[in-house]
């Protein structure tokens, strides 16, 4: 196996590489420099980008004019940043640097020569033309293809599969000529699918059990014949109906809506329910009685004139209403509102002692004197009250059993008078104590706490220093 040549990324750009770079940028754009570099084995993505931006990019090419030389001189004196200068002039940065070196005679600006990048480039072997031809052929093939890598791979796979299928057919044909029957093996992709040459598509196996198949063909034939006869009969009846159908009405015939309106119809009369026929008079009489009671309950009219009919034609109707009202009033009892009716007279009292007692209770209930407040009863009650007041109250057996005696109203008022003064004095004392605590005691306490903290810290430091001195003196002995 021949040795694989080792390429060093970099080196001088050749004319062929520049042409491949232009074609690759035209195909992949100015953002996929790794794809562009894949067509150039000796160059990286960064080198392809730099070569494109500085030299190969199709900017202004040709001879320099006097105005461009003046602009180049002004920009180069301010700071020779050749990318910015090239963007301002519309030329590559390398061309601007070379032009400035040509104008000033400074070769250090243009950079070293082409052969000075690699030391001892003259002693190295020349690049063989075979590698360059392979690079150009690969770039031409990749740039000329209109399909992607996946599409090309799938096309190759389809060609391989077709060639395999043809080979299997030729092999089977040869075996059949030799007298050996062999089925074509299914590919792996469709191994679990149905084979239309060997299987029955969508076959349903009959259920397990006794199943008679002797008369199955006869039953199928009879069912098909019955269906055909039914279809034929329906078709004949349909044709007969179409032949008997009347002809269509002409376009000038009156619309169906107008014909329907022109036909006279009797008014709709519904039968009256039997319940209303039987009880139709009873509710009317009850309503009339109720209205008559309401009219009787109204107060009497305050005007002293009668309402006379406007014309003589109204008198018969009024007389008829009066007759109806008189007829209804004949069956009604006189009725008055309860507020205007007097109380019924009391029943006659029963004779005897029980009757007297009953009369006394009734009189007391009506608002008269009590039945027991007779003069004798009143005198007896006063005597009992005087006797009870004259008797001295017995001393209590225990002091705790005595009932508390409430002070009089004057005593309570006298005791309540000095309370506002005492409340004001208490408020003043509380205010003075709060001020003393907030403005004097608490600040004094804070000051003393700080002094104590400072002195205690000084004491701790001094005690630590003394302990250190004692320890040193003890160690020195």
Swiss-Prot record:
Cellular localization per UniProt: Cytoplasm; Nucleus
Myb-like domain sequence ranges: 59-104
Keywords for the protein's UniProt record, in alphabetical order: Cytoplasm, DNA-binding, mRNA processing, mRNA splicing, Nucleus, Repeat, Spliceosome
Recorded coiled-coil stretches: none
One GO cellular component, as annotated: Prp19 complex
Keyword Ribonucleoprotein: no
Region (Disordered): 233-262
DNA-binding region, residue intervals: 33-56
Cited PROSITE patterns: HTH_MYB (PS51294), MYB_LIKE (PS50090)
Domain HTH myb-type: from-to ranges: 1-58
Gene Ontology terms describing biological process: mRNA splicing, via spliceosome
Pfam family for this entry, one: Myb_DNA-binding
Transmembrane portions of the chain: none
An example molecular function term from Gene Ontology annotations: DNA binding
Classification via SUPFAM superfamilies: Homeodomain-like
Repeat listed as a keyword: yes
Organism domain of life: Eukaryota
Gene3D superfamilies, per the entry: Homeodomain-like
Role of this protein: Involved in mRNA splicing and cell cycle control.
Recorded family membership: Belongs to the CEF1 family.
Assembly and oligomerization: Associated with the spliceosome.
Name of protein: Pre-mRNA-splicing factor CEF1
Organism: Eremothecium gossypii (strain ATCC 10895 / CBS 109.51 / FGSC 9923 / NRRL Y-1056)
